[in-house]
Amino acid sequence: KNLSVVTSATAASKSTIVVNGVKEGAKWYYVTAATQAALEAVTAGTAITKANWTELTANGLEITPTSGHKYIRVVDVDSADKPLAVGDAILSIGE
């Protein structure tokens, strides 16, 4: 299932992450990367490796991505950390 993810530039080097819709699973996690191909892969039915992800604790959370990172992937996981939905977006970062 696809998540609709949008980002908005805020303060210098920061971006606000908004996931449209209601969280279906237990938690949201995100990862950023310099290219879309470099984003952490997600496989249906296989738990994510939480050490590679950061919990998105609130919708509309402001983050400070690693310098040079231009993409974000958000995953909605169940209580066993298995993906229910995933979405990618280009990071809008404040200057």
Model-found features: residue ranges?
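Short coil/turn motif common to extracellular beta-sandwich-like domains
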Residues: 9-18
